[in-house]
Amino acid sequence: MDNKKNIIVGTAGHIDHGKTTLIRALTGRNTDRLKEEQNRGISIELGFTHFDLNNNLRVGIIDVPGHEKFIKNMLSGVCGMDMIILVVAADEGIMAQTKEHLDILNLIGIKNGIIALTKCDLVDKEWTELVKLDIADEVKGTFLEAAKIIEISSTEKKGIDNLKDEIIRIVDTLPEKDLNSNPRLYVDRSFSITGFGTVVTGTLISGTLNLDEEILIYPSNKLTKVRNLQVHDNNVNIAYAGQRVAINLANVKKEDVPKGSVLVPSNTFTESSLID
């Protein structure tokens, strides 16, 4: 087993407030995958990457789209997140999708987070303090009420080390991942690769998932097998709860396992139309 502790951090916030740029400053990678995203300068699909903090911690990053038209894509990525970085640009402050993302995260029960005040190099100190007061007022009564607000300039790399330190501090308070329950994965991407077939990605919520394991797809009730298994672009024989996982599935079409599907071992879960 990989000795590193695995956690998932998501971003949230209004369009063009610097989520993708912040992640590039943290990881050195660009999470805008699609040509359309590169051309338009906005995130449409979920973006994924990772980086290591010290010798013991691997942080998976989910970069969610901020534009209102792509809010359903944002929703598909929030399952399995250990914490959120709410990104607010200092030159604009709280905006429509900031509030919308905050409401969604609060409703689904996210418990931990950090507020990244980006683009601080574009405004003076007095304006920064006013925006921080506005943010504090907006997050009152939410899971971010006591969250630290970290001033950042991604282009100048200012505040990045402070952000990493706060991630480590929060991780130290998180419970250990549940490796003993049945594996469960919510699909947030589904696509086909020529020569390989259907591939899905998601965060493994609980348990462990093995190469060649037989699993069931809900709600399509299709039985399939794990043909290939990757964690952070590396082929593995077993994946553990808390890891970002890509799975090559045998004998199913991508239409059989759309975004939002759940992968579990057969005869372990039951479908329901009720929510408690």
Where are the regions a protein language model picked out?
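Short, ordered loop/turn segments at secondary-structure junctions
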Residues: 14, 67, 89-93, 118-122, ...
